[in-house]
Amino acid sequence: MKNLSFLINRRKENTSDSNVYPGKAKSHEPSWIEMDDQTKKDGLDIVHVEFSPDTRAPSDSNKVITEIFDATEDAKEADESERGMPLATALNTYPKAAAWSLLVSTTLIMEGYDTAILGAFYALPIFQRKFGSQNDKTGEWEISASWQIGLTLCYMAGEIVGLQLTGPSVDLVGNRYTLIIALFFLAAFTFILYFCNSLGMIAVGQALCGMPWGCFQCLTVSYASEICPLALRYYLTTYSNLCWLFGQLFAAGIMKNSQKKYADSELGYKLPFALQWILPVPLALGIFFAPESPWWLVKKGRFDEARRSLRRTLSGKGPEKEILVTLEVDKIKVTIDKEKRLTSKEGSYSDCFEDKINRRRTRITCLCWAGQATCGSILIGYSTYFYEKAGVSTEMSFTFSIIQYCLGICATFLSWWASKYFGRYDLYAFGLAFQTIVFFIIGGLGCSSTHGSKMGSGSLLMAVAFFYNLGIAPVVFCLVSEMPSSRLRTKTIILARNTYNVVSIICSVLILYQLNSKKWNWGAKSGFFWGVLCFCTLIWAVVDLPETAGKTFVEINELFKLGVSARKFKSTKVDPFVVKTPPKDVSHNDPKGDIEASIAEE
């Protein structure tokens, strides 16, 4: 770690003589903080306090001054080290943090699985005959568009409620216990789905299961971003997208098996519901032993617990590990303190819209996640149903869905490689551009009724899935964790995910009307609509979405505070830890307040 040996030696010197402070002794009365020129040249930016040669112990004011600036120095050092840390070093230093993050994010496998089987049920013959109605014109059985819309609305409404409950729950008991409670309720609510005998029971079960799903959506992203360093942030936040895909792939495989072996048996839809009981218990046990987010602990003033939590995420032993823990805690303290000075209130949902800075951060986070719906990804979730309505056989529709999710997994892994060469914004925008082109081609093929055009539109939807999971799908999970301030991160992510859910409800209604033979019956021609909407999302990204690749949370805070435009985020360099020399007429009665105010002004 950069300058780590210096910091270890500096701390040893400080503890050996409590009267000695970083800097040079002068033969005059105590003066305000000055920066040592040689230290500047060394790149260490160590602030020191000048004092008289009196052998008496330093005054309480000087102690406070030194403590504050030591914390600021440590915060700066931790921030610089995090920004310059290579991937291999990060994995070697934070292996346990990565493992805990992967465990927590695995809860999203269940949400990806649960939401995917619902869309696949609409193409399952036994489900259609059990809960659907027969089309008088075609003689085919299908679930009515109104019920499809209703079931979608139920689980999304449940997610919205669950997300809103997540905020106060996290404030009260933290991330770990909130996730464990959500897993318990998910296992309990699954009984309703397994024993369903009507669409009404399925609607109730979906609404109740949606509440823990909403919790998973928020906390997996915020936990991954807070427990891991910058070098691992993209990989561990975008792993959430992989978990979604693993769940959807698992669902597609189970549904294909149900279509082949249980086409005329109630096990065709009961077995997929029952498999939801596999993960909650082992995941709850694992999360119980996971460390709490150090950011949450520092916000609660539980600094010793934050240090213990950080020790559990780091490898190695000895003074280097302890120094790294101290640096990180000091950085978190300084970051949160600077954010608190922007408002006198505790973090609440209203704070997300309180001033121009937070309004901008909230807007970008919400629209960024809403882009996952407006880019046409909801159509991918109904891919099996889409393939059927495009003229592909039921068996081939399920096969196409499996291929589609496999391509999505490969694309997400490819995005990890691409993130080394392209920024967050680049992947988001390029993905949208490619999807726009492919959607227009799908719409054009929908104007033809030949077998080749039907197979072509189905194949191109797989191309949409590939570009979606290469660009916008994974990168959104990283962006929404970086845009909010640390103090409002959980609440901003909740608002953003609920924005996504509301937009998804609208998009789902449109898709079901577009594909249902009793409604608009657009089929593949719906590609034109989603191509236009995807292009509009691309225009917003170009105008409003900042580039945050390579930026630490402290730097992002400073860039938003300075009002840097979206397209200049990448090139603008800031130093959030520069400390101004206070004016001569400043009061020395409260040195802590004066100095902290000076720091906050930066």
UniProtKB/Swiss-Prot annotation:
It is a multi-pass membrane protein. Induction: By maltose and maltotriose. Repressed by glucose. It comes from the Eukaryota. The lineage of its organism: Eukaryota, Fungi, Dikarya, Ascomycota, Saccharomycotina. It comes from Saccharomyces cerevisiae (strain ATCC 204508 / S288c). Gene3D superfamilies: MFS general substrate transporter like domains. One of its GO terms (biological process) is carbohydrate transport. This is Alpha-glucosides permease MPH3. Its main location: membrane.
